[in-house]
UniProtKB/Swiss-Prot annotation:
It comes from Psychrobacter sp. (strain PRwf-1). SUPFAM superfamilies: dsRNA-binding domain-like, Ribosomal protein S5 domain 2-like. The lineage of its organism: Bacteria, Pseudomonadati, Pseudomonadota, Gammaproteobacteria, Moraxellales. Coiled coil: none annotated. GO terms for biological process: translation. This is Small ribosomal subunit protein uS5. InterPro entries: Ribosomal_Su5_D2-typ_SF, Ribosomal_uS5, Ribosomal_uS5_bac-type, Ribosomal_uS5_C, Ribosomal_uS5_N, Ribosomal_uS5_N_CS, Ribsml_uS5_D2-typ_fold_subgr. GO terms for cellular component: small ribosomal subunit.
Length: 165
């Protein structure tokens, strides 16, 4: 599960650590890959992958990559703007806004991203591959594609009331 740390106002979550190997003439060379998620709990979130011969070095590289790779998410209070389906590779993630008090109903990788972003009420379901890297990327694709009614109205040149119907 995700390991959580607070650092300079950012919530850092460790999603997964995997041991990988490279086969050479003399045998195998083992190294570690880490997948981390970083967020401020207020709509900014990023993810990163790091690879090194030691676990702490891989985690540190992943955290630095996550801080460089942050996006801003338009939230509707403590939930999402609208239901969204996003995919990356064979992973598909469905995210739906939920009423106050519902909580974050999500699996490990999706939960880490949404909690780091500051989402408090959401329903999610993963379909297809549950590879943590692809699930995190699919979640990011969904959050990036989500737009507020204000943005949609400005893009179409209409009022927010016309958009919401």
């Amino acid at each position: 599960m995700a390991k959580v740390e607070q650092n300079d106002g950012l919530v850092e979550k460790l999603v997964s650590v995997d041991r990988v190997s490279k086969v050479v003439k003399g045998g195998r060379i083992f190294s570690f890959t880490a997948l981390t998620v970083v967020g401020d709990g207020n709509g900014r979130v990023g993810f990163g992958r790091g690879k090194a011969r030691e676990v702490p070095a891989a985690i540190q590289k992943a955290l630095e990559a996550a801080k460089r790779n942050m996006i801003t998410v338009d939230l509707d209070g403590a939930t999402l703007q609208h239901p969204i389906i996003a995919r990356h590779g064979a992973s598909k993630v469905y995210m739906q806004p939920a009423n106050e008090g519902t909580g974050v109903i999500a699996g490990g990788a999706v939960r880490a991203v949404l909690e780091s972003a500051g989402v408090e009420n959401v329903l999610t379901k993963c379909y297809g591959s549950t590879n943590p890297t692809n699930v995190v990327r699919a979640t990011f694709n969904g959050l990036r594609d989500m737009s507020s009614p204000e943005k949609a109205a400005a893009k179409r040149g209409k009022s927010v009331d016309e958009i919401l119907g």
